[in-house]
Amino acid sequence: MEKKRYYVGMRRFIILSSFIIGFVSFFISYNKKEDASLLDKLEQMMCRTKMNVHCDPFYGYQIHYPAFFEQVPDSLIHETGCCQFYFGNMLKIAQTAFIVTNLDGFTVRQGMEHFAMEQHATERRCGNDYFLLSGPLYINHRPVEGYRFYAKYVQRQKLWFVQSLSYPASCTRAVSRLIEQIDNWQVWE
């Protein structure tokens, strides 16, 4: 009889211990997920999300944007060939594509110097038919505190096809996938 009671007591102890360990493990892992910062969550979302493709109906260029970004309705954009996608959950991230007419007939290098000065770019890189600019974000010649921009200008005849990203400086690592997409952007794929 004493042997049976020993097994029953041991079984209760093992079941109770397993339940407590499972509960504590769940509680710890749940709290760790809550402790992940918004930037870490954004970075994970950017890495895992599907990229949607937008094809401009007038010019035919394509851009890739994260599936969780929202598109600004065409009715709010009055420029032909312009589109914008954004993520506005406390952090304001905007991916924009638009067309600029090259009325002055700038070469790629001249265009880079002109737009770099206009946008207060601190970094620039030039290719055969494109250039990349980045730096602190300015709107109406005033700096936007804590924000940066990254843009690619591609020259096609008398047009500049532009894809630009504006984002909080604290999100630089989180938007690295979008920056890489802009780096590799071909106007017509």
PLM features: residue spans?
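Acidic/histidine-enriched, beta-strand-rich ligand/metal-binding domains
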Residues: 51, 172-176, 182-184, 188
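Ser/Thr/Pro/Gly-rich low-complexity linker/stalk segments immediately outside membranes or between
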Residues: 31-49
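Hydrophobic membrane-insertion alpha-helices, especially the h-region
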Residues: 13-29
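Signature of long, low-cysteine stretches enriched in small and polar/charged residues
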Residues: 108-173, 189
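Secretory pathway targeting signatures of secreted, lumenal, and periplasmic proteins
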Residues: 52, 57-112, 138-142
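Buried hydrophobic packing residues in well-ordered domains
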Residues: 69, 163, 185-186
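Sequence contexts marking disulfide-bonded cysteines in secreted/extracellular proteins
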Residues: 46-48, 82-83, 125-127, 172
